Curated annotation (Swiss-Prot):
Function field: Member of the two-component regulatory system GraR/GraS involved in resistance against cationic antimicrobial peptides (CAMPs).
Annotated Response regulatory domain residues: 2-115
Protein source organism: Staphylococcus epidermidis (strain ATCC 35984 / DSM 28319 / BCRC 17069 / CCUG 31568 / BM 3577 / RP62A)
Subcellular location: Cytoplasm
Pfam family, one: Trans_reg_C
Keyword list, A-Z: Activator, Antibiotic resistance, Cytoplasm, DNA-binding, Phosphoprotein, Repressor, Transcription, Transcription regulation, Two-component regulatory system, Virulence
DNA-binding region positions on the chain: 126-224
GO molecular function terms listed in the Swiss-Prot or TrEMBL record: phosphorelay response regulator activity; transcription cis-regulatory region binding
GO cellular component: cytosol; protein-DNA complex
UniProt-recorded name of the protein: Response regulator protein GraR
Residues carrying 4-aspartylphosphate: 51
Amino acid sequence: MQILLVEDDNTLFQELKKELEQWDFNVVGVEDFSHVMETFETFNPEIVILDVQLPKYDGFYWCRKMRQQSNVPILFLSSRDNPMDQVMSMELGADDYMQKPFYTNVLIAKLQAIYRRVYEFGVEEKRTLSWQDATVDLSKDSIQKDDKTIFLSKTEMIILEMLINKRNQIVTRDTLITALWDDEAFVSDNTLTVNVNRLRKKLSEIDMDSAIETKVGKGYLAHE
C-alpha cells in the first residue's frame, strides 16, 4: 500500500513510518511543505495521511488541492481538540479523521479498512448504473446527467451505490456505517450524516438533491 504521510513533526513522522513499514506499507513524506502537491503527483499514493497543522498552508488547503484532481482516500490527523476540524475535513472530502494522541494499531486498522472499501469493495460489480435520468460511473466516481458531470469522493460513491442497488428500499444507517468502515467503533454517526449531506449538495448541481430521502430514525432511500 502506497502511503503519503504529510506530517511536519519529524519525530512523529519517523515513528509512524517505522511502524507502518512493519506492516509492509510503503511510506513517503514531504520535504518542502510549500510544494506538497509535487510529491503527491510524483508518488501517486493510494492513501494520504494529512496533518491539519502544517507550515505555510494547513492540511485543509492541501486537501482542497488534492480533491481538485483526485479522489484518493485522505485521513486527517489533528492535535487540536476542535469538533469543527472534523466537520471541516469531512466537508472537504476526507475519508476519516483521528485526533492526536492515538494508538498506532487503531490507525493501521483504519488504513486497512479504507483500503478494503475503496480498492476491493464491489470489484465484481458492473461499472455503470442507470439511475433516474443519470448515468453513474463507478470506475470514475462520477455522475452524468444531460450535459453536466459531477465527481464524488470514494465514500460518497459507496454510499450512493448501496442506495441505488436497494432503490426504493430503506438502507439503514448502521448498514452504511458497517460497509464504509467495517467497524462502527471507527466512525461517528455524525460522520455519515456529513457525507450524505455532502452527497446531496453535489446532486443538487444536477437537480437531483431530492432523489435521496431521509427516513428519520431509520436511514436513507434512493428513489427510482
